[in-house]
Amino acid sequence: MRVGILSLMQESNTFIQNETELNHFEEDLLLEGEDIRSTMENAHHEIGGFFQGLRDQKVEAVPIFTARALPFGTVSSSAYTKLIERMFFLTKKAGKLDGYLVAPHGATVSGEYPDVDGHWLHKLRQRVGSGTPIIGTLDLHANLSLQMVEATDALIGYRSNPHLDQRDRGVEAAEMMVKMLRGEINPCQKAVFPPFIMNIEKQCTTETPCKELYEHAEKLRERDGILSISILQGFPYADVSEMGSALLAISDGDDGSAEKVLEELSEKLWNSRSQFDGAGVDLETAMESLNEITGRTCLLDMGDNVGGGSPADGTLLAKALMTHLVERSFVCIYDPYATELACNAGIGHSIMLQIGGKTGSDNGTPITAEVKVRGIYSGKFEEKQPRHGGFSSFDQGKTAVVENNSGLTVMLTTKRMAPFSLEQLYSCG
């Protein structure tokens, strides 16, 4: 048996003015054929899980196309057209396959296609026909659509946020594919779409209220005939009609068991919905709280979420830390121009910089400050442990670490980087 592997992943923030272009995929992952195997086979990613699951079952994996970009604005129409044309050219070139393992994100948006994932999955189904299995994974933040459900035999969502189980879900999808091809199971997929969206502040799966919801799902997963249950939290930064939380269940045969567990799980979600309201505080309150806290403290600007597509050059927290003279404070800001100026000045030299706030005023205006250059780095680092997003190799571009006499240290980067790994800090001293 031969099973193809396809992936197109990007989390689209529709509130960002700039679009995600083809070069953003090239800077992250844009791979074809055996390059996918050599790059992803051992990764903490569902594609790595696809390879492992098929290999364990002695089924041939046929890697076809993989594209991934860091969360940012919507994918430009030209970029999406080029990506999908290449994907289906390579799919045709791969010849007859017994099934397809797919890894969409679930919250990708592009111009006339607010449901990119559903669009390309539907096109794949049209091309391969109803008799060829299509089984895949979804990011836990997917905005599930009926089109995605109808185009596939089974979709399996991550079970953890931060996303540490991507490889496991890939293995699970591959095992389900092989069992289906061997006639051992007959997956029947059902979904419900409650009128609800989880506040992103409350989406950690190891803390209340998500913890209890996911524990309940684990119990339901043990029911006879249930192959998979997924809680898709949704991505609130994609302002599309599909935006919202959804539940998926896959049963072995259409015996009503999937509908039953979905009814129970959706009832529990709905009855606890008030617990998912955000509890954020204003910036001044956050600063004042530092006077009462000892030890390390992490301040989160929920509107400047790089992992959710923000520009990464927000300055509101940095300005507040400087104003309040918070010693030994630290921020990371994407600013290629300021980084180059700091690198040109050299380690140990002081320079006046305008830092951040260059992509728009929503997340603050530039900071004008005199800083001393403490270090200059390549910006490349590796992570050996499973981390959110399945990344293992990182490149935030040339990096400069500078310090202001207020006590603030700033890591300046030439590429946007979400805080997925502590190696980002360790690699820069």
What do the PLM-derived regions correspond to, one by one?
Residues 65-86:
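Charged, often glycine-rich, active-site loop that binds/positions anionic groups
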Residues 408-429:
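A C-terminal functional module that forms or caps the active site or interfaces directly
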Residues 1-56:
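N-terminal amphipathic/basic leader segments beginning at the initiator methionine
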Residues 201-407, 411-415:
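Hard-cation-handling environments
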Residues 30-32, 63-72, 103-105, 265-273:
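Gly-rich Lys/Arg/Thr-decorated short loops/hinges at beta-loop-alpha junctions or inter-strand turns
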